[in-house]
Amino acid sequence: MIQVTVLVDSKQQNCGILISGHAGYAEAERYQKGQELVCAAVSALALNMANSVEHFTDTPFQADMEEESGMFCFRFTQEADAKAALLLNSLIFGLLDIQEEYGEPYITICYKEV
């Protein structure tokens, strides 16, 4: 299962995200290796968000990814500008859509104040 934790600051603004695990969707649906749809979608959305924040905004952040474990950490290191906040919120929106489509056996999303 993929576990997503959205980090929320004291102003109730999303300020980061932690993603870990593997969905197991391919195994459950008897797909062949390489057809892990849920993991691929989550990875594509997360990496696109981080690359977009870097390319299109001036908001500093820290990011780390471990391919084998499926771990992805992203956090703004100062208050996000409007563009950066929109990109993070767009990622969260996409992850919520994946959760709605494929269900909680494959992806869970929670929020944590930091």
Go through each PLM region and give its residues:
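N-terminal intrinsically disordered, cationic/polar leader segments
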Residues: M1-E36, L47, N51-V114
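Short, surface-exposed ligand-recognition loops at beta-strand->loop->(often short) alpha-helix junctions
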Residues: A44
